[in-house]
Amino acid sequence: MTRPRHSTGIPKLDDALGGGLIPGTLTVVMGATGIGKTQLGVRYAHTGATQDGQTGVIFDLTTRGDSQNQSEYAQRMCGWKLRERQFSGHFDPASVWSPELARSDYLHAFTRGGRRVTIGDMQPEEWQEFKADLMRRLDQTIAGFYGNFVHGVRRCVIDGVEPTNQDADSFQFHLFDYLYHQVLRKEHDWLARDLFRVHFRSQEQLVQQHAYNCDTISGMFLYTSHEVMLEDLISRPIRSGDILSNANTIILLGKVRDGARIGRALYVAKHRGSACSEEILPYRIVDQGLAFE
C-alpha cells in the first residue's frame, strides 16, 4: 500500500515534489551557509505534528562556530519550543519508555569546543580522543533516536555539517553514515538490542509493545556546500562515495543573478520514484521561513 507523502510544510515545494517527500527515504538539502537550509528543515520537522502526530527530531552535528539557530527559528516560525535532550555521564536506557523522559526535539551530541571536522586536520591523538568521545556518547544518541521513534516520531533532520573537499574526510559524514544505516534504517528490535545489550531479554516485551516500522522513518540531511550559485550546484558532479549518490531526493538552494539583483532559488535535482517539477523556483527568506514567489 502506498504511504501518504511527507509534506515539507511548504505547499509550493510539495507541488514541485509531486505531492511531497517519499516516507522512509533520505532527502539531501544542499546549499551554502545562510541560504535557508535550516529553516526548511525546521519547517519540515514541525509539520510532523499535524501529519504524523509528533514533531520530528533535529540532530545537530555542530562542533564549532555559532549555533544553527534551530530553537530561535522554531519559536519564531512555528511557535514551537524545542525540547532538548541533555547528555549526561550516566543514564538509564529503560527511560525510553517514558514519553516525558524520552521525547525530545533537539539532540546535540557534541559541544562547540572548536574541534575541526576533517580527519586530516586532527593529530592522531586527537582522532583517538574523538573516537573515544564518540563511543561514550553513542549509547545516549541511540537512546535519543529510539526513544523518539517508539513514541511516534517519523522525521529526522541532520544539521550543522561543515563543507569538506571529500565526504570521506569528515567525521561528521562518518557519523551520519552510521546513524542512517545503523539507527534510522535498522529494524526496531535490532536497534533495541544495540541499546539494551545484555538487558534486552528483560525489556523484550516492552520492545514488542512499542514496535514501529523503520521504513516509515525519513531523514533530511542539510548539506553545506562550497558552491554559492545555484547554477554551480546544478552542474556539480557527484563524486564516488558522495552522500548525494545514495539520496532518494536532492533539493538545491542557491543564489541566482537577475540583472543587477541577486536572489535565491530552489531546484529539485533528483526525486527518485516520483514525478517532480523541472522549474527553478525563486524564493525569499521572511520571518516565517522560505516564501516562494
Please report, for each region that a protein language model flagged, where it lies by residue.
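NTP-binding/hydrolysis catalytic cores, primarily Walker-type P-loop NTPases
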Residues: P23, F130-L134, S277-E293
